[in-house]
Amino acid sequence: MNQVMTIFLVLGVIVYSVESSSTPDGTWVKCRHDCFTKYKSCQMSDSCHDEQSCHQCHVKHTDCVNTGCP
């Protein structure tokens, strides 16, 4: 059981290291934060008044993260 946990821990560290080296953490975190801030503003605005219109806020947030964040 200990060997299995060690293997998963090592794999997790490797994946984290690869992710960290491929994208600067500060930029990625700031980008995600900016997208989420826009999402919250969209939900609080008058354009979010029913399920379908509020869903557009989610769509815009997803697009922001997928296309704008490295």
From Swiss-Prot:
Toxin that is lethal to crab. It interacts with divalent metal ions (zinc and nickel) suggesting it may function as a metal ion chelator to regulate metal ion levels or as a metal ion transporter, or that its function is modulated by metal ions. Is not active against any of the voltage-gated potassium and sodium channels tested. In addition, it does not show activity in bacterial and fungal growth inhibitory assays as well as in hemolytic assays. Residues 1-20 form the signal peptide. Keywords: Disulfide bond, Metal-binding, Nematocyst, Secreted, Signal, Toxin. The keyword Magnesium does not apply. It is found in: Secreted; Nematocyst. Disulfide bonds join C31-C69, C35-C64, C42-C57, C48-C54. This is U-actitoxin-Aeq5a. This toxin interacts with divalent metal ions (zinc and nickel). This suggests it may function as a metal ion chelator to regulate metal ion levels or as a metal ion transporter, or that its function is modulated by metal ions. Both Thr-23-Pro-24 and Cys-69-Pro-70 are in the trans conformation. Expressed by acrorhagi. Has the structural arrangement of two alpha-helices stabilized by disulfide bonds (CSalpha/alpha 4(S-S)). GO terms for molecular function: metal ion binding; toxin activity. Belongs to the Acrorhagin I family. GO terms for cellular component: extracellular region; nematocyst.
